[in-house]
Amino acid sequence: YIALPFWLRPAVVNHQTQADTKMTIAAFIGLGVMGYPMAGHLASAGLEVRVWNRSPDKARNWAEQHKGTASASIAEAVRGADIVIVCVGADPDLRAVFEGPDGILANAPSGALLVDHTTASAGIAEHLSKQAAGYGQHFIDAPVSGGQQGAENGQLTIMCGGEPEAFAKARPILAHYAKALNLMGPAGSGQKTKMVNQIAIAGLIQGLSEALHFAEQADLDVRKVVDVISKGAAQSWQMENRSGTMIDGQFEHGFAVDWMRKDLGIVLDEARRNGARLPVAALVDQFYGDVQDMGGNRWDTSSLIQRLRKK
């Protein structure tokens, strides 16, 4: 039996075994609500996982829980790694972890795969891809959709931008926490696809908020209304998963308003560059600003309905 390199092994989403990737060394940078469980899936799959987090205690806790390694620095984590996976906050955070003498680019080996799950601008993805190529590394922008629940359950949707060969190598690794995993085009294409996703979500949540608010004002049984219309053309993931909590005024079930505003800011910046007209997305961004003014910074995105209920 001759063991194939990990990138030549079959890649079937959510059907990997420990033997498929047991020799792969993965560095995971950023252990937030998404990164922590994602790194855990890699460890459970049998990869050698080294983690680094800005708060060292979280890295140590992760390493103890998952029998991995908590690295003292980014440089220590990425040296000799086959794949480096990043999940941080925004463009400035990406520059902080990738660039400089102690960053990923200067310390990851030539030939390494560099995968970024951060929702960021297409411009930073294109920039880091060019920088990585200068080091002989392969960068993939790979923002995700599915939220904390998707990360914990290994059921994320991942939208990738980069070289087909690099994507083929990364796919069997990323498959450990993905239900859908697609290459959308060259560097930056993953981020642009995530922008499309956020535009659609913004409109859906605003529409659902107005529908539920109207039903409330019309003295209808709102749950019965949802039960009926969810069986027709109005059905959506948001209706199925968020209508009940919206009716109950519970907004601790997902992606925070602060992060959605960050994402919509990226969307609107890109639209100014490419000439897309996004009147509804721009309005919803302002509406989320109203929610922030109400103290809802950490409420989930379905809290748009609260600004309609405000007397």
Q: How should these model regions be labeled?
A:
Residues H15-V86, H117-T118, Q148:
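NAD(P)+-binding Rossmann beta1-loop-alpha1 motif at the extreme N-terminus of oxidoreductases
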Residues I74-R79, I83-V84, D91-L156:
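Rossmann-like NAD(P)(H) cofactor-binding subdomain of soluble oxidoreductases
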Residues G154-G161, N182, P186-A218, I229-N241, ...:
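Active-site-proximal catalytic alpha-helix in oxidoreductases
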